[in-house]
Amino acid sequence: MVMVMEKKPYIISNVGMTLDGKLATINNDSRISCEEDLIRVHKIRANVDGIMVGIGTVLKDDPRLTVHKIKSDRNPVRIVVDSKLRVPLNARVLNKDAKTIIATTEDTNEEKEKKIKILEDMGVEVVKCGRGKVDLKKLMDILYDKGIKSILLEGGGTLNWGMFKEGLVDEVSVYIAPKIFGGKEAPTYVDGEGFKTVDECVKLELKNFYRLGEGIVLEFKVKK
């Protein structure tokens, strides 16, 4: 893993997907990665400062976002992008296994402020940045200043789109499983409104590839 000295964390976008780019079936069955790939991901987790997901991933999967498939003496900071502060108070990402940062907007109301107080009493740090939706560029500045210099992005299609659109991703690591899910409503790696032209799109440089279990891993550098 090559670290680039910038005033933002080095972002690795990781995904396990089917050959047709799906993250799950239309019924949210996301059994895609093999055990070998899960170990690969946890090795990356063990070597970064933070793991970032969107609130959609928390609501659908209730992940722990810790290093538990391999032996490790540390867990990265867990970062959840949650514009409307919808995180359930019993979500596993809020447990004491690792530090958690919830990124939400500066928009406020009485109910939201009460929930922030509850989260802070639970030991969760709440960061406010942006109006309407979380300002991802500003969030990266805040996280960098907190000493988080590298992040594994394990987002769904919405957060991934926001990060790619803002030019914040440095590296892409993809496990492709030999499966076809289909379904126009099935979640994909990158959603959002999409780029209008090829000239605007994110361009990648293939750095490495190898077989893993029944699938294949592709590693790319994002061209800046």
UniProtKB/Swiss-Prot annotation:
InterPro entries the UniProt entry points to: DHFR-like_dom_sf, Rib_reduct_arc, RibD_C, RibDG_C, Riboflavin_Biosynth_HTPR
SUPFAM superfamilies per record: Dihydrofolate reductase-like (SSF53597)
Source domain of life: Archaea
Binding site for NADP(+): G16, T57, D61, S83, K84, L85, R86, V134, G156, G157, T158, L159
Pfam families assigned to the protein according to its UniProt record, in alphabetical order: RibD_C
EC identifiers of the protein: 1.1.1.302
Entry GO MF terms: NAD binding; NADP binding; oxidoreductase activity, acting on the CH-OH group of donors, NAD or NADP as acceptor; protein dimerization activity
Keyword line: NAD, NADP, Oxidoreductase, Riboflavin biosynthesis
Listed transmembrane segments: none
Pathway(s): Cofactor biosynthesis; riboflavin biosynthesis
Recorded catalytic activity of this chain's protein: 2,5-diamino-6-(1-D-ribitylamino)pyrimidin-4(3H)-one 5'-phosphate + NADP(+) = 2,5-diamino-6-(1-D-ribosylamino)pyrimidin-4(3H)-one 5'-phosphate + NADPH + H(+); 2,5-diamino-6-(1-D-ribitylamino)pyrimidin-4(3H)-one 5'-phosphate + NAD(+) = 2,5-diamino-6-(1-D-ribosylamino)pyrimidin-4(3H)-one 5'-phosphate + NADH + H(+)
Single biological process term from Gene Ontology: riboflavin biosynthetic process
Assembly information from the UniProt record: Homodimer.
UniProt record similarity statement: Belongs to the HTP reductase family.
Note in the entry: The protein sequence in PubMed:16730025 comes from protein expressed and processed in E.coli.
Function: Catalyzes an early step in riboflavin biosynthesis, the NAD(P)H-dependent reduction of the ribose side chain of 2,5-diamino-6-ribosylamino-4(3H)-pyrimidinone 5'-phosphate, yielding 2,5-diamino-6-ribitylamino-4(3H)-pyrimidinone 5'-phosphate. The beta anomer is the authentic substrate, and the alpha anomer can serve as substrate subsequent to spontaneous anomerization. NADPH and NADH function equally well as the reductants. Does not catalyze the reduction of 5-amino-6-(5-phospho-D-ribosylamino)uracil to 5-amino-6-(5-phospho-D-ribitylamino)uracil.
Name of the molecule in the record: 2,5-diamino-6-ribosylamino-4(3H)-pyrimidinone 5'-phosphate reductase
Species assigned in the record: Methanocaldococcus jannaschii (strain ATCC 43067 / DSM 2661 / JAL-1 / JCM 10045 / NBRC 100440)
